[in-house]
């Protein structure tokens, strides 16, 4: 008498039927699905005996459920990457490791045009002016806190304007008496020589280089007849009765003693010390 060939679980005869052998036991397909089948990680349904199964690190999927967690591309017959418990296709795995755009927060992948500034990166078209929203891309810009401005908007909102030409000072520039100038606008009123970094004299809101001040503006010393510039040796001046002298030229007409910061007598347009004045 032959031994019975029955399902281990329901005891239904298996003779002439499809069955599965699991752990040395025979079971019908119905009982296999109910008691023995692995559960698909994705759909949470049992993986039946006649279904194709994918397993990886003690986890199981129907072959058509084994997809990239990002783009859902089927991966049953392709290479894949496991990252933080997620199954990813190679393309999405690359994106996962790629830097994120500060503007749109999407991955910047190989081939994308991008802009990097102080360790932060943007897609080229995401790097825009905080004011006008136009794309700055790889053009010139001005950072202001967390914002970025194109040249035009920065000039309008923040740049100082030259007191002479009233145009924005975008770089360099100088300040004189709290007023901003372009270096090329701050020039001698007579010869147009640039005065930035040079000695100059201001007379009634007009600016002169040393040579032009000497030749066209400076008073002449009543003693030596040379210009009194206020520079160098002649920086100290004596003025009296509408006339001016270098301090070193202000001396007695007769004895030549220097009278700067001393008592003197002015007689017939001439300067005398008190002793010589008594002898006149």
Swiss-Prot record:
Zinc finger (C4-type): 7-31
Cross-link type Glycyl lysine isopeptide (Lys-Gly) (interchain with G-Cter in SUMO2), residue numbers: 86
Domain LIM zinc-binding per the UniProt entry, residue ranges: 40-92, 101-153, 162-212, 221-276
Gene Ontology annotations for the cellular component aspect, listed alphabetically: cytoplasm; nucleus
GO terms classed as biological process: cell differentiation; muscle organ development
Keywords recorded for this protein, A-Z: Acetylation, Cytoplasm, Developmental protein, Differentiation, Isopeptide bond, LIM domain, Metal-binding, Nucleus, Repeat, Ubl conjugation, Zinc, Zinc-finger
Residue numbers bearing the N6-acetyllysine modification: 4
Residues modified as N-acetylserine: 2
InterPro entries: Fhl1, LIM_FHL1/2/3/5_N, Znf_LIM
Superkingdom, taxonomy of origin: Eukaryota
Tissue specificity statement from the Swiss-Prot or TrEMBL entry: Isoform 1 seems to be most abundant in each tissue and isoform 2 much less abundant. Isoform 1 is highly expressed in skeletal muscle and lung, and to a lesser extent in heart, brain and kidney. Isoform 2 was found in brain, lung kidney and genital organs.
One annotated GO molecular function: zinc ion binding
Biological role stated in the UniProt entry: May have an involvement in muscle development or hypertrophy. Isoform 2 binds to RBP-J and plays a negative regulatory role in the RBP-J-mediated transcription in mammalian systems.
Protein name listed in UniProt: Four and a half LIM domains protein 1
Gene: Fhl1
């Amino acid at each position: 008498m032959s031994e019975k060939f029955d399902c281990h679980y329901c005891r239904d005869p298996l003779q002439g039927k499809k069955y599965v052998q699991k752990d040395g036991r025979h079971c019908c397909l119905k009982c296999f699905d109910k008691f023995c089948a692995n559960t698909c990680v994705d759909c949470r349904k049992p993986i039946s005996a006649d279904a194709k199964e994918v397993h990886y690190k003690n986890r199981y999927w129907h072959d058509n459920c084994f997809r990239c967690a990002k783009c859902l591309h089927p991966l049953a017959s392709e290479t894949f990457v496991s990252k933080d418990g997620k199954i990813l296709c190679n393309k999405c795995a690359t994106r996962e490791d790629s830097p994120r755009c500060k503007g749109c927060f999407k991955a910047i992948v190989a081939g994308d045009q991008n802009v990097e500034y102080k360790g932060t990166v943007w897609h080229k078209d995401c790097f825009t002016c905080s004011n006008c929203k136009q794309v700055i891309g790889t053009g010139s810009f001005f950072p202001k806190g967390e914002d970025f401005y194109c040249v035009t908007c920065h000039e309008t909102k923040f740049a100082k304007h030259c007191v002479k030409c009233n145009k924005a000072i975008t770089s360099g520039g100088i300040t004189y008496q709290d007023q901003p100038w372009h270096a090329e606008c701050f020039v001698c009123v007579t010869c147009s020589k640039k005065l930035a970094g040079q000695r100059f004299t201001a007379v009634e809101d007009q600016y002169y280089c040393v040579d032009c001040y000497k030749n066209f503006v400076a008073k002449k010393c009543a003693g030596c007849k040379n210009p009194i510039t206020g520079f160098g040796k002649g920086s100290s001046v004596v003025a009296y009765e509408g006339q001016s002298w270098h301090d070193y030229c202000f001396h007695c007409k007769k004895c030549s003693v220097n009278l700067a910061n001393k008592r003197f007598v002015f007689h017939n347009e001439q300067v005398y010390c008190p002793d010589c004045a008594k002898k006149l």
